[in-house]
Curated annotation (Swiss-Prot):
Chain's role: With S4 and S5 plays an important role in translational accuracy. Interacts with and stabilizes bases of the 16S rRNA that are involved in tRNA selection in the A site and with the mRNA backbone. Located at the interface of the 30S and 50S subunits, it traverses the body of the 30S subunit contacting proteins on the other side and probably holding the rRNA structure together. The combined cluster of proteins S8, S12 and S17 appears to hold together the shoulder and platform of the 30S subunit.
Gene: rpsL
Top-level lineage group: Bacteria
Gene Ontology molecular function terms on file: rRNA binding; structural constituent of ribosome; tRNA binding
Signal sequence bounds: none
Record text on subunit structure and interactions: Part of the 30S ribosomal subunit. Contacts proteins S8 and S17. May interact with IF1 in the 30S initiation complex.
The protein's name: Small ribosomal subunit protein uS12
GO-annotated cellular components: small ribosomal subunit
Residue intervals passing through the bilayer: none
Length: 123
């Protein structure tokens, strides 16, 4: 056990923080290709048809990513931008698709909170 003097001089080494978005390989965003676009149902007690896509990332890893917002234009072979961020009621979905980037269109007629959905300001 170290003495207080040794701790003052050296300090303790912290535990390294484990990443929750390993497939991004340390990047904030990654490009990928949709291999499958489908809907899935959330865990209890919620009920819906959540839109998700299987995406093969440029890092070579295939992940499941959530498609946020109402309506989308994605299909197989669409090029998308993927960011981290899980969906609490969908097990195994730890990534989000960025709306308004690459092949993904922004959400139509979105008035508030437009930034996350790639919607332009209505004139």
């Amino acid at each position: 056990m170290p003495t207080i003097e040794q701790l003052v001089r050296k300090g303790r080494r912290g535990k390294p923080k484990k990443s929750k978005t390993l497939a991004l390989k340390g990047s904030p965003l990654r490009r990928g290709v949709c291999t499958r676009v489908y809907t899935t149902t959330p865990k209890k007690p919620n009920s819906a048809l959540r839109k998700v896509a299987r995406v093969r990332l440029s890092s070579g890893i295939e992940v499941t990513a959530y498609i946020p917002g109402e309506g989308h234009n994605l299909q197989e072979h669409s090029i998308v931008l993927v960011r981290g961020g899980r969906v609490k009621d969908l097990p195994g979905v730890r990534y989000h698709i960025v709306r308004g980037a690459l092949d993904t269109q922004g959400v139509k007629d979105r008035k508030q909170g437009r930034s996350l959905y790639g919607a332009k300001k209505a004139k």
